[in-house]
């Protein structure tokens, strides 16, 4: 594989391709400053009890691991494992337990006042049907037929809710989790080792309370604190800082421990392009922008196996029919 392919896939930046192909001047030696780096206390995410190592860099506290938080719907809400395919929404159908729950919930919805017919309550019959259903003495079809006889509007409303079942939080959670667990089994447990790959929209909502998705300026502050000259940190669509990627990657002296997780990269074609696992790392920032005046994009950081520098530039946030997926680190300010 050409060394240029990962860069083209990640950013589609003519400037980046030119920079990588031309080589430029001899690399300048940078004396990085580790005096501002200290190990931080472990952080336990109260949402799921995941524990993260942290590192203090100046007056910032960074997670030293990629985020592993799964939103309710997993990939349906923008958090993917490696090579995970989208959930087929047409196949999210309720099982008997879910239909029973929908019937029970709909019947007891106070908005419908017991589904009385001409002022006559049907509760005594329906309560009995639901009990028989839960005991396995009636089928769902039999219950629906009997309730339809008592009040056709009930079954009409139930039909609408069944058609919208895939939109319910519990349905999305079950379908997303099932898809995720199958994918993790197939790929050997990618997320446990590398964290989720997030869409830009999901990345913006993924941080625990008190933390945030770092902005482009947060990243530049990290880089400057480590000793990257300000003028170089500000370079856009460019590789910056000879040795900076080594410092930030797993085993580097900064303790940041960026993992070469790969990502689902930007490319014009509509297929999935999970690329560069064990070769490159990609991180979203919280800083959005637009390309060509209207194309949604965001600032990112990446490093690839063919350089010790870190790229600062922009990436589109979506492809044709599929999202772009990168890793997430979280940061907070120290008082």
Predicted regions and their residues:
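Conserved positions within compact, well-structured domain cores
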Residues: 27-109, 121, 167-335
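Residue-level detector of alpha-helical secondary structure
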Residues: 100-107, 123-134, 140, 144-151, ...
